[in-house]
């Protein structure tokens, strides 16, 4: 009997098992995308005071050996209470590894100090070697901190090389020498760009979009404002006829205005650098923003100084929480990348030695 199905096989159609039907609805879009999300800080001064005072006491009892544990507890508290899109930050550094690095760093410091008592030449060589190691120290410290920092399940990663660090360091020296320090803001910009342009969260890359003139404005406007105030005070006194009546009083008034200006100029610079940096930083296609007010920031820093002095340092935790909360909660992120797609990069473990050498020799590598 003739079977027509064998003679004319059934043609596969798009709805057959060989050609599954295309989904009628597109993949679900992450509802977080396209919105501006604000950072939040959940810490409190009372909680941090408990951590801070215990850290101080244990460092005294252990002659400073508890310092790595104190550092990790402090960073974990601040990181762990910082939140963005319902994800918390975390610091995963291991205290005993930091302790080993600190002991080696202290050993280097002791050797240089002892040698300096017997040979000026050896001391100079030691200082020069340490100075030449600064780019390596900075780069290694940033890598260590990034490797041990997390956002949700995504680790941070720093890809800057030693070659790039030394090239930036050399350019900074040349610029500083040939401009007699007048272009110091350019050095700040180069350092910020080196740090941020090589920083990743998972596989999402940070980028600093600001140019060096933005940092010149950020740092020199407070300076011009300071000298403008001094000039205005001088003109007002001249118009009031005080210049010739009481020159001694005039000198003291200028000294007071000068000291007040110096008291305000650095916090104002710090505020403007903070604003310039974060309003011009992106991570992949997502963009950071800050509504930080430069005068509010300056007020917080100055009053923190006053409160810490009047309280003999006991209000240090309150001051630290106050400033950090303002910085964090002024930040927001216009999210254009799916945070669920963050994939960690393969990283090697990094030594804490460089960070501890930086701490011992007071080399500031903060962002």
Identify what each model region corresponds to.
Residues 1-40, 333-367:
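Low-complexity, intrinsically disordered extramembrane tails and loops of integral membrane proteins
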Residues 36, 71-95, 142-154, 340:
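Membrane-interface amphipathic/juxtamembrane segments adjacent to transmembrane helices
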Residues 38-58, 90-111, 153-177, 203-231, ...:
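Interfacial aromatic "cap" segments that immediately flank transmembrane helices
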Residues 53-73, 131, 170-190, 302-322:
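Hydrophobic, aromatic-rich membrane-embedded alpha-helical segments
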Residues 65-78, 133-147, 183-199, 267-278:
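Membrane-water interface of transmembrane alpha-helices
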Residues 70-86, 187-205, 319-339:
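Membrane-interface alpha-helices
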Residues 71, 109-130, 229-266, 270, ...:
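Membrane-helix interface segments in multi-pass membrane proteins
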Residues 260-367:
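Intrinsically disordered cytosolic tails
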């Amino acid at each position: 009997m003739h079977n027509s199905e064998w003679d004319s096989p059934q043609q596969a159609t798009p709805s057959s098992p060989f050609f599954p039907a295309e989904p009628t609805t597109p993949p679900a879009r992450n509802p977080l995308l396209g919105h501006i999300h604000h950072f939040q800080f959940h810490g409190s001064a009372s909680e941090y005071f408990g951590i801070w005072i215990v850290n101080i006491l244990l460092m005294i009892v252990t002659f400073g050996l508890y310092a790595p544990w104190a550092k990790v507890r402090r960073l974990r508290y601040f990181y762990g209470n910082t939140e963005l899109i319902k994800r918390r930050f975390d610091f995963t550094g291991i205290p005993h590894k930091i302790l080993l690095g600190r002991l080696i760093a202290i050993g280097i410091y002791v050797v240089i100090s002892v040698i300096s008592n017997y040979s000026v030449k050896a001391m100079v060589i030691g200082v020069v070697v340490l100075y030449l190691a600064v780019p390596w120290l900075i780069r290694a410290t940033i890598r260590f901190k990034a490797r041990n920092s997390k956002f949700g399940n995504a680790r941070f990663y720093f890809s800057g090389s030693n070659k790039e660090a030394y090239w930036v360091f050399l350019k900074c020296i040349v610029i500083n020498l040939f401009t007699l320090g007048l272009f110091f803001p350019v050095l700040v910009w180069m350092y910020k760009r080196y740090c941020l342009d090589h920083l990743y969260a998972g596989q999402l890359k940070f980028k600093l979009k600001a140019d060096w003139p933005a940092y010149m404005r950020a740092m020199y406007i407070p300076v011009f404002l300071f000298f403008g105030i001094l000039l205005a005070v001088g003109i007002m006194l001249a118009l009031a006829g005080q210049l010739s009546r009481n020159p001694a009083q005039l000198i003291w008034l200028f000294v007071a205005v000068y000291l007040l200006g110096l008291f305000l100029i650095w916090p104002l610079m710090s505020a403007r650098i903070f604003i310039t940096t974060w309003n011009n930083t992106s991570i992949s296609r997502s963009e950071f923003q800050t509504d930080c007010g430069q005068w509010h920031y300056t007020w917080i820093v100055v009053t923190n100084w006053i409160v810490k002095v009047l309280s003999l340092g006991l209000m240090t935790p309150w001051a630290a929480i106050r400033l950090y909360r303002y910085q964090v909660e002024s930040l927001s992120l216009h999210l254009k990348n799916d945070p669920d797609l963050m994939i960690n990069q393969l990283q090697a473990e990094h030594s804490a030695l460089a960070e501890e050498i930086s701490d011992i020799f007071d080399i500031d590598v903060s962002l």
